């Protein structure tokens, strides 16, 4: 995700939290080169930890965000054992969701790692009695909306909504019918948006 796009989403999360920016903590899964943690720092918050396995992106974040802890692979992280944060961001692998790939979807080996992020978030919520995280930001390609005829995106929304059972809200089920979404507004705040980098001061056409 381009930096201006990322700042938009992180700033909105900071605003909704309603606490001084210097008290806001962010954790990043599938971190890449640290765009989301950088946004947190630019907003006055604290990027606490990140999960990434590729050495070159890790080298970038170690240089620019030397105080951020690196946790390694998402498959080895226990959400109940790491420092709780207000915001968890994750850009899980997109290859199986992208229209440029074979579109194995969330059943694919790479894009299926989405569920590891959900597991970590669930574990943190359970360990903190639903207090952390307060916000979850998932970033991916537009193909995520059409993968497997939209069924994969339905899974994503349902997984996010079902996190509410750890906050005292009870489990929810998001039902798709005739191409429309219902049983949504009564179950918490979940929103999605497609942004195009060219309209955010970045010289590329990328959604």
What does each model-found stretch correspond to?
Residues 87-89:
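N-terminal Rossmann-like NAD(P) cofactor-binding module of classical short-chain dehydrogenase/reductase
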Residues 32, 51-52, 73, 134-140:
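Active-site beta-strand/loop signature of hydrolases that rely on acidic residues for catalysis
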Residues 1-53, 57:
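S-adenosyl-L-methionine
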